[in-house]
Design a protein with these regions (language model features):
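Membrane-water interface at loop-to-transmembrane-helix junctions
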Residues: 755-774, 794-800
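Conserved cytosolic headpiece of P-type ATPases
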Residues: 1-750, 760-761, 774, 785, ...
Length: 895
């Protein structure tokens, strides 16, 4: 944010100094000056980058080496007049581009979501007059009138504050509202401690005042985040990178083979050029796994549907694959690992210490003496009842149940926590009447009310313990009054502060008969301390389990928060985060160079008092160490880091629209445990993708080998381009879906994340492709050699070869469904997808072999039943051979 001035940042300047530095006055600037500054600084709007038009994004999907092969093949077939081949090949290329374009249709809306956070109108003071203007017309030097419920329209320096409290959790991650004041601050302070600044996009919780505009548009803190989002280039997932490399390797192999065969055929075979070119086009089409991109997308989409049923919405398809490789989750604390609902966990009185059950705003939970297992019933007239009535009445918040049955509070979270505590017990009936009130203010750090309770006037007080200690001379017990034992209270405060609890004290004093007004002077004597509440934003119980699951799966969890280090470490220990006994702050991170930051990112698991830049840099530092990073969060402050992360995970209920749009995955139940389920599903999907790739590639190799053998031997072209495309786009794609429904392995969440550097086509995969592809090709070639001397037509022979390859594919799909063990196991019956795709495949083959219009289009002929039997036997023999190969090659395989 543009808060630096020659005299120091704006938060270090007094109100007068700030007015001087912005050339403004308490009455604001003139309309003429505002117009001039609008020309100088521009509109109070976030900069926008021009997006690519849809047609250009569509054409970009043709920028792929394998698509180049198809386009070249289409061009050559068109020149040769083979229009059916041309149209089919072009259709395949267009379908692949369309699938990629549709995937991209959820493209970046993050920046627009940030812009939507800006309010539309603001009340300003110009030349002493109040005016309502569009927020886009705000300029530095304007004075903005602030009221409860307003969304802050620009970055402001507070120049007037009346009990002003602001909700900044979306920006800083702090779960408590921030008290704002006009006083100048000293030292270098993180965002959350700049209590005299108001930030664009945050919301006024209560109170009001005025603020001087010190930054607009792209110069605001929100603008800074907007720029970070715009500058981030999203990483490609490991699988996509590997597919690119595989495509380029196939492209080079195709060029070399085509060149070699072209020269060989010209020199040693008397083959017409047109026939030779058609053979080479068939070879090119056969070598390209045209259906693979579409199949990968569809399998990922099926994984997306499964995750959606498990309450994880995947916004970007490749995220499904990346989840399986994730090694680190960087999680925001507030609202993600914790409830974002401040809850009282302990009550300290002069007589006893109590623990309080419950972890949310729902008013359910017993109160136990700290050393007793059984809960107590709060009796009328006891110290505890007086304490609970005090925190209930000296309170501006309300506890309500919304239409969906969720409990919520209005007002600040600290008062809300006290209100919930009081609602957990049934207080004895008493008539109450509020006579007077001193609202809470950060200047004096307490709130006080004057009530008539029954027939007595009573003054009730809640506030910071150190302030109430100065007001109190006595403490209340169940047996009467005692002198204040301040060392006892300070020891208890220190004890519970180490556990991350924030402390709020409560006190009372009798009021004078007939008193109707309350002043600060009334609180300077005779105040009696009742007790202290220790409260915290508690961990989500399900998050504790989820973190354990992640650790078991080899995924390290790191907590990144805007809270204080002691609070962060306490929460970290409760959650079971690995190195929760040590924390490092954003201030320490800021002075580190990249090398030091990289080491700190690996060493620490708790990062406190962090800014958006810190979170962003931490993700980058972990990625520099080759970690695959997931980042969870719900506030705007998390959005840049979410976008930078390999997997950005947003909260669906409490998350802002900005965060959701920046994320790759949105949890609809805000449940950290859903991440563990998503990781499990991501690993299952990747396993099935690898099985699918291993299934498809041997068929392409077999097709290519058949054509190469035919050219070398001077035989008939065994497969035309359209038949090859039928196998690659129809039968291969259909059968691949059967593998997509395979269940996950039993040890899927007990093995470490896979290494992204390991190629899906590892040594074993290459062996399997060559072994199976060669076996299929040799079988088909032998069958072709047997058929040719018997006078069958080329169309008949090609139809037999097509059925042979398709049947071999079907049996090999059964081989691929189980990496180890026999494929015809019980799981085969459980996977209904196998049988559905088998039925679809049968229908497709019947159509292409026996339907007249398909025969005309693809050049096939009807087959007698005995050829179905022959091809079935060939396929079954190959199935048995691969099953025998599995145990022999087990030691070569990678996990």
């Amino acid at each position: 944010m543009n808060t630096e001035k020659p005299g120091g940042p704006f938060y270090q300047l007094s109100v007068d100094e700030t007015l001087t530095s912005t050339n403004s006055t308490p009455d604001g600037i003139s309309s003429a000056e505002a117009t001039a500054r609008l020309q100088q600084y521009g509109e109070n709007a976030l900069p926008q980058k021009a997006g690519k038009p849809a047609w250009l994004r569509f054409l970009a999907h043709f920028n792929d080496v394998l698509i180049y092969v198809l386009l070249a093949a289409a061009l050559l077939t068109a020149v040769m007049g083979h229009w059916v081949d041309t149209l089919v090949i072009l259709g395949v290329a267009v379908i692949n581009a369309l699938i990629g374009h549709i995937q991209e249709s959820n493209a970046e809306k993050s920046l627009q979501s940030i812009r939507n956070m800006l309010s539309s109108e603001a009340v300003v003071v110009r030349q002493g007059n109040h005016e309502t203007i569009p927020t886009t017309a705000l300029v530095p030097g304007d004075i903005v009138v602030i009221r409860a419920g307003d969304r802050i329209p620009a970055d402001l320096r507070v120049i007037e504050a009346h009990n002003l409290r602001v909700e900044e959790a979306i920006l800083t991650g702090e779960s408590t509202v921030v008290e704002k004041s006009t006083e100048a601050l000293s030292g270098e302070l993180p965002l959350g401690d700049r209590t005299n600044l108001l930030f664009s996009g945050t919301t006024v919780s209560s109170g009001g005042g005025k603020g001087l505009v010190v930054a607009t548009g792209g110069d605001t803190e929100l603008g800074h985040i907007n720029q970070m989002m715009a500058d981030i280039e999203k990483h490609r997932t490991p699988l996509l990178v590997q597919m690119d490399k595989l495509g380029k390797a196939i492209f080079i192999i195709i060029l070399v083979m085509m060149a070699a065969l072209f020269v060989f055929s010209l020199l040693f075979r008397d083959m017409p050029v047109s026939e030779l070119m058609l053979s080479l086009i068939s070879l090119a089409v056969a070598s390209v796994p045209e259906g693979l991109p579409a199949i990968i997308s569809i399998i990922l989409s099926l994984g997306v549907q499964t995750m959606a049923r498990q309450k994880a919405i995947i916004r970007k398809l490749p995220t499904v694959e990346t989840l399986g490789a994730m090694t680190v989750i960087c999680s925001d604390k507030t609202g993600t690992l914790t409830m974002n609902e401040m809850t009282v966990k302990a009550v300290i009185t002069a007589d006893k210490v109590y623990r309080v059950e419950g972890d949310s705003y729902e008013p359910v939970g017993n109160i136990h003496p700290i050393d007793e297992p059984d809960p107590i019933t709060v009796a009328p007239g006891t110290l505890l009842e007086r304490y609970l009535r005090t925190i209930d009445l000296c309170n501006d918040s309300q506890l309500i149940k919304d239409e969906s049955g969720l409990w919520k509070i209005t007002g600040g979270p600290t008062e809300g926590a006290l209100k919930v505590l009081a609602a957990k017990v049934t207080l004895s009936p008493a008539s109450t009447e509020l006579r007077s009130k001193i609202p809470f203010d950060s200047q004096y750090k307490y709130m006080s009310t004057l009530y008539r309770i029954g027939n007595e006037e009573t003054i009730l007080i809640t506030g910071a313990p150190d302030v109430l200690f100065r007001l109190c001379q006595h403490q209340q017990t169940d047996h009467g009054l005692e002198p204040l034992d301040q060392p006892y209270w300070e020891a208890k405060i220190e004890e519970y502060a180490r556990e991350g609890l924030r402390m709020v004290a409560a006190a009372w004093k009798p009021a004078a008969d007939g008193q109707t007004e309350l002043t600060h002077q009334d609180l300077q004597h005779g105040v009696i301390l009742l007790g202290i509440a220790g409260m915290m934003d508690p961990p989500r119980p399900e998050a504790i389990t989820a973190i354990g699951d992640c650790l078991q799966a080899g995924i390290r969890v790191k907590m990144i928060t805007g809270d204080h280090p002691q609070t962060a470490m306490s929460i970290g220990k409760m959650l079971g985060i690995g190195n929760a006994g040590n924390a490092i702050t954003g201030r320490e991170l800021e002075v580190m160079d990249d090398t030091q930051l990289s080491e700190a990112a690996q060493k620490f698991d708790i990062f406190a008092r962090t800014s958006p830049e810190d979170k962003f840099r931490l993700v980058q530092a972990l990625q520099s160490r080759k970690e695959v990073v997931g980042m969870t969060g719900d506030g705007v402050n998390d959005a840049p880091a979410l976008k930078q992360a390999d997997v950005g995970i947003a909260m669906g209920i409490k998350g802002t629209e900005v965060t959701k749009e920046a994320a790759d995955m949105v949890l609809t139940d805000d449940n950290f445990a859903t991440i563990a389920s998503a990781v499990r599903e991501g690993r299952r999907v990747y396993d099935n993708l690898k099985k699918t790739i291993l299934f498809i590639m041997p068929t392409n190799l077999a097709q290519g080998l058949l054509i190469i053998i035919a050219l070398l031997a001077g035989n008939l072209i065994p497969l035309t381009p359209v038949l090859i495309l039928w196998m690659n786009m129809a039968t291969s794609a259909t059968l691949s879906f059967g593998l997509a429904f395979e269940a996950g392995e039993k040890n899927i969440m007990r093995r470490p994340p896979r290494d992204p550097k390991l190629h899906v086509m590892d040594g074993f995969a290459i062996w399997r492709v060559i072994f199976v592809g060669s076996m299929i090709a040799v079988s088909a070639f032998v069958l072709e050699a047997w058929l040719q001397p018997r006078g069958y037509s080329p169309e008949f022979i090609r139809t037999v070869l097509l059925q042979t390859l398709v049947t071999a594919q079907w049996f090999y799909m059964l081989n691929c469904r189980v990496a180890d063990g026999f494929s015809l196991s019980k799981g085969l019956l459980a996977n209904r997808g196998i049988w559905i795709v088998s039925g679809v495949l049968l229908v497709l083959q019947l159509l292409i072999i026996y339907a007249p219009f398909m025969q005309m289009l693809f050049g096939t002929e009807a087959l007698p039943f005995r050829y179905w039997v022959i091809t079935f036997i060939i396929g079954f023999v190959m199935f048995l051979i691969v099953e025998i190969e599995k145990p022999l090659t087990r030691k070569w395989r990678t996990a």
